[in-house]
Amino acid sequence: MGDTGLRKRREDEKSIQSQEPKTTSLQKELGLISGISIIVGTIIGSGIFVSPKSVLSNTEAVGPCLIIWAACGVLATLGALCFAELGTMITKSGGEYPYLMEAYGPIPAYLFSWASLIVIKPTSFAIICLSFSEYVCAPFYVGCKPPQIVVKCLAAAAILFISTVNSLSVRLGSYVQNIFTAAKLVIVAIIIISGLVLLAQGNTKNFDNSFEGAQLSVGAISLAFYNGLWAYDGWNQLNYITEELRNPYRNLPLAIIIGIPLVTACYILMNVSYFTVMTATELLQSQAVAVTFGDRVLYPASWIVPLFVAFSTIGAANGTCFTAGRLIYVAGREGHMLKVLSYISVRRLTPAPAIIFYGIIATIYIIPGDINSLVNYFSFAAWLFYGLTILGLIVMRFTRKELERPIKVPVVIPVLMTLISVFLVLAPIISKPTWEYLYCVLFILSGLLFYFLFVHYKFGWAQKISKPITMHLQMLMEVVPPEEDPE
């Protein structure tokens, strides 16, 4: 009897073990459709619905405006192809971080993680959630601005929801991304089809003399590109989750080749649709371009526009959280952040500590009043690191010849993108110099202080503080260090 019970328990243990993954690490659960959804869902946020006037205000004419939108899509595609070579050559998650590490060593990689994790990505997450909150609140406060406390509480709730979803399951996070990407493509399709119908009916007067009065100075064109490329930001998001892509050698470049041209086509056609209904002056005066379009074309069903803009923003926020959590995870794994941030949930197999940390920092940024100016001043730092990363691709063509390159782009593409990155970093400083850009550079360089204190020299007192914190957090969240996946 006892032998039978013992045998049964052993069989049960084997059955349980057979259902567990071989290693406690991030699993390859994302396919091509999820990859395309992350690219499209992260790039298309609230910008194209709310404020495409930023490009028009610098070009001051319809023709150059549409050309800029198309050119920005081409540049985003070229940049993403450079990242595709990097992502298939160095198949680690974390976006620019592992590429900077391989090309230049730990210091540039640490400065990237420092700037991205403390300011750039959390503020973007917070702004997207605040935008979502304002659109959800708007129908309940017709004729007046909703109270800030309501907006901020709802934004914090959105951050909590998205962080929870992505901490619970990789698959659940990708399902949420797929659903909201589908929802935003529905409203994009409605706007495009409505605009093309109006265009076919002869509403073309706003396209007559479309280059008249164009502002073609170097400063104006550079700022137009700067604003347009900001709307395309997110083209590199798939490189943050390379380790979770099934067959990354195929799916990474394919998702880029499909996803970014799809976004480019949507952006151009949506702008065409806007101009069939509004003159350039009316578009510049509109507070929310898509809402104005809806009021003029979709009435009495115009209420669907703010609803789907809310879906769009929450989808962009989910994509940002999904990918940025992996950057914290990889930085923690390399010892550039608290070690516990690189740990994996035993039950969920997600980088839960990294996602929770990211959500907390983003929530802190909601507390102050207006942080849009902060994001604007730090946005040029993104192109600084894009440029450094793509330059690293050129450097590794000479220093890391032994690395396998399933995808190899012509060298002219990374050279061109490096020069464009330099231009985009310097253009706003030269055209409109302010002290804030200097403060931004000083903040990035201040990361060196933390690097030498806590990473390079690893003082004993710092280890004594971090070890008990790591141990208690590990027990609280049921997380363990990631294991190497045996080949």
Curated annotation (Swiss-Prot):
Changing P482 to A/G/S/V: No effect on amino acid transport activity. It is found in: Apical cell membrane; Cell membrane. L-arginine binds at I43, I44, G45, S46, G47, D233. This is b(0,+)-type amino acid transporter 1. Changing I44T: In CSNU; type I. Changing W230A: Abolishes amino acid transport activity. It comes from Homo sapiens. Expressed in the brush border membrane in the kidney (at protein level). Kidney, small intestine, liver and placenta. The gene is SLC7A9. The modification Phosphoserine is found at S18. Changing N227D: In CSNU; decreased amino acid transport activity. Changing G105R: In CSNU; type III; severe loss of amino acid transport activity. One of its GO terms (cellular component) is brush border membrane. Its main location: membrane. It is a multi-pass membrane protein. GO terms for biological process: amino acid transmembrane transport; L-cystine transport; neutral amino acid transport; protein-containing complex assembly.
